Amino acid sequence: LGDVYKRQAEGYLRAHGAEDLLILSRGEYPHAFINRPTFRRIEKDDLFVFSVEIAGVYGYWTQIIRPIFLSRGSHREAYEVLCQVKEAIQAGVEKFRPGNLICDVDEAINRVARKYELSKGVWAGHSMGIDLGDGYNIGESNKMEIVPNMILTFHPSLLDKNGEGVLYADTYVSTEGGARCLTDKYRESPYWEDLKELVK
C-alpha cells in the first residue's frame, strides 16, 4: 500500500501547488531509514514512516518526515526512541541561531544521543533551499556559521542497542530570535487514529 499512499499524496500536493516532490517511506524494521515506496502490504500493527520533500512554486524545497503507528501500544521500543529523537532535535534547534556554528547544532544532538546511549548515523540532517539537500550537512566537521534565514532539515538517525530507531524530521529557518519551524503539522501524535481526526 505504500505506493498507493504515494500516488494519493502526490496528487494532493500537486493540486496544492507543489512543483516537484520526492516521496520516500519505510514500513519495516529498521525504521530509521527510508527508501522508495513498495507494494508491501501495511499490516494493522505496523509502523509506517512517510517522508515528503516538496518544491513549491518558487523552487525552494522543504521536508517533513512522520512515523505513523497503525495501532496504539505497538512498537514500544520504537516509540521510546522516537521520543528521544524529538528531544535530540529540540536540543539542536536551540543551537540553530545566527552566530553559532553547524557543528554546535550537531554536538547538541550528540549530547542527547549519548544520554540515552543511542548510536548516531553519519549526519543529523541537511540544508534545504533551491536544491534538494542544498550542499551541506549537520555534522561535527561542519564549521559553517549559521546566518539569518538559513534553512536546515533535522532528522538524526539514532538507533538503540537493538538497532531500532525511528526517522522523524522537521525543517527550520534560523532567525535572530531563534529557529522557526516550517513544518509544524501533524506533530501532536504519531498514532493513525489521532492523525485521521486531524486531516478531516
PLM features: what roles do these ranges have?
Residues 2-200:
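Active-site neighborhoods and metal-handling regions in enzymes and metal-associated proteins
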